[in-house]
């Protein structure tokens, strides 16, 4: 694990603006000085539709993904919809992640959404309304060039449901049933 005080997760086909890390770190430090429960920050994301051909990526379009999210703390209502906050748009205080992440399978295509629900049950996440992350969607449907989660959508749905059910059965997360 990183020696840093912060942690980001990056999908292999997603990308960040050059100022992503410095901007999120700066804003998170300012927010934490006022709201100590905020231990992570997520920025707006742009969806990039692309095709992979041989050694080239052809971008077909770029459009806002979650620009409807306002500055401030994320509410549970927002994360009711899967992928409203992509994994690669978040920066976490590492210490706030350690206990939460242990009960989630990092290699699962369904890792982030159940993890994020569990994380939000214990911490606040701040939205920075600046598009600094890019959520790439490969329009290819083959395993070599396509998106793993899209290609394995059935496995994603199954693992998501199992992770959600496990959280709902947990005494610690029973408040999520209300």
Predicted regions span which residues?
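Hydrophobic helical membrane-anchoring modules
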Residues: 139, 143-177
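Nucleotide-sugar donor-binding/catalytic module of glycosyltransferases
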Residues: 1-154
